[in-house]
From Swiss-Prot:
Record protein name field: Trypsin inhibitor B
Miscellaneous comment text of the record: Electrophoresis identifies three genetically distinct variants, A, B, and C, that are inherited as codominant alleles.
UniProt site positions, description: Reactive bond for trypsin: 63-64
PROSITE patterns linked to this entry: SOYBEAN_KUNITZ (PS00283)
Protein role: Inhibition of trypsin.
GO molecular-function terms, A-Z: serine-type endopeptidase inhibitor activity
Record keywords: Disulfide bond, Protease inhibitor, Serine protease inhibitor
Length: 181
């Protein structure tokens, strides 16, 4: 089945979407500096429910018009404002291992990035188009895929995206209206 946005339209291959939580208490997905990072290299969920986050380009290497559940995907932030020091950082998402919070979703150049891809899977069969993000390692059978969930930083409450054994982050997709930016 095609992955549908919050208006019921299939996601376009290469389209730009806000990735929003199904729980309105939190905002969308964006990049932020965590730990001792000087640039926003960590993919996080905004704690401001009015913040839709950064538009994310969702693309599949397959020559298809629309994204279907289970397609291998690349996720990449559309351009966003950063301080001069951080201009030019690659914005494609990757999963980096050996971090205190576990395998975490990052952007930028990461020599510890795991070879793999993301995919989108539906979480419920109701009228709400609720999905989860999944990360699969390159050699993956299905059991080598992990749901993308949230790890909450005990120091400052930052909500980092991580490959999780616990509850997946349930999301919806909202098409970025380029005209309104």
């Amino acid at each position: 089945d095609f992955v549908l946005d919050n208006e019921g339209n299939p996601l376009s291959n290469g389209g730009t979407y806000y990735i929003l939580s199904d729980i309105t208490a939190f905002g969308g997905i964006r990049a932020a500096p965590t730990g001792n990072e000087r640039c926003p290299l960590t993919v996080v969920q905004s704690r401001n429910e009015l913040d839709k986050g950064i538009g994310t380009i969702i693309s599949s290497p397959f020559r298809i018009r629309f994204i279907a559940e289970g397609n291998p995907l690349r996720l990449k932030f559309d351009s966003f404002a950063v301080i001069m020091l951080c201009v030019g950082i690659p914005t494609e998402w990757s999963v980096v291992e050996d971090l205190p919070e576990g395998p975490a979703v990052k952007i930028g150049e990461n020599k510890d990035a795991v070879d793999g891809w993301f995919r989108i899977e539906r979480v419920s069969d109701d009228e709400f188009n609720n999905y989860k993000l999944v990360f699969c390692t390159q050699q993956a059978e299905d059991d080598k895929c992990g749901d993308i969930g949230i790890s909450i930083d005990h120091d400052d409450g930052t909500r980092r995206l991580v490959v999780s054994k616990n509850k997946p982050l349930v999301v919806q997709f909202q098409k970025v209206d380029k005209e309104s930016l």
